[in-house]
Amino acid sequence: MSRRQRGVALLIVMLMLSLMVTIAASITERSGKAWQRTSNLLNRTQARWYALGAEALISNVLQRDAQASPESTFIGQPWSKVDHQMMADGTEIRAQALDGQACLNLNALSPARNVTPNNASGNNTSGNNNAANGSSGNGNSPQPPKVGTSEQVPYAAQVFRQLMIVLGEDPKQAERITDALRDWLDEDSEPLMNGAEDDSYVNFHPGNQRMTDVTELRAVMGMDAALYRRLLPYVCVLPVDKLAINVNTLMPGSAPLLSALFMGDISLDMAERILQQRPPQGWRNLNDFMGMSALPESGKNGARQVLVIKSDWFFADIQIRVDDSEFYQRSLFHRGKQIEVVQRQYGGYRTVNP
């Protein structure tokens, strides 16, 4: 074999070797990715079942609390405690229940028309119970009409506007955002005085229906990122259009919401002190709360429409860690005669917890 032929043969061998190495590397990479995908799928499936187990446990706790205290819901009951568990296989479970009525339900800003009012919390209580609580649970009684219109402003919308003002927003801008949000929720395409319908949005239309997630608030005309973040701890979305806020589960950090419920007639410091002075098992009825000397008479009529001492809507934030994988789930419970899970959300869904 000539020298030239030996060189060609060596070149062919090197080419074949490089091709074999490339193929082997590709097979190894694909096998590794397939193994990783399988591992992730198994971890996710395992985490999901753990989350459903945590959800069932929270459901049982809510049911027991309702049986132990059928007329009131307050901080200090078992449902309000964070549960942190380490399983035998190394899985870490963290679950926390949150009162869905310790926040302002955005869907209450545009209640359905010509509908007989019901208790917003979903309670099937009698008139006597409502009288004892001092509230019918309906947060949308007619209010004085807005200037220049015949539209009656729901009390929840007034609270939302006042909440933005308490958080430092300009009153005129707060009015515009409130009307824009009401237009987002209502079924028609007629804008309110300061509202926004189809013509105000580019490339998409307002929902014209109830919100299903609080993140929709970011898309409302006039809502910027800074205000959105400030509002997040105090607002939520429930699948009802009534407002009922439980004074027994408001934390001192919710002072801006309490101040807004009284239209700013109580300062943030005073609202925080009121919540700090709450009895260990909450106020026995709404009249005990309303009888506090620190509360201004001017705001009691409005606040009485929406304040309650019993909750029937709860969120559960569940975090599962399996090996290096993390799984997040938020469940929404409705507590009536039975505990029902009405919604589940997966993954990171917001930047601030309520």
From Swiss-Prot:
Protein name: Type II secretion system protein K
Keyword list, A-Z: Cell inner membrane, Cell membrane, Membrane, Protein transport, Transmembrane, Transmembrane helix, Transport
Oligomer and partners: Type II secretion is composed of four main components: the outer membrane complex, the inner membrane complex, the cytoplasmic secretion ATPase and the periplasm-spanning pseudopilus. Interacts with core component OutG.
Keyword Protein transport among UniProt keywords: yes
Gene Ontology, cellular component aspect: plasma membrane
One BP annotation, GO: protein secretion
Species: Dickeya chrysanthemi
InterPro entries: GspK, GspK_central_sf, Pilin-like, T2SSK_SAM-like_1st, T2SSK_SAM-like_2nd
SUPFAM superfamilies registered for this protein in UniProt: GspK insert domain-like, Pili subunits
Compartment list: Cell inner membrane
Positions of region (Disordered): 114-151
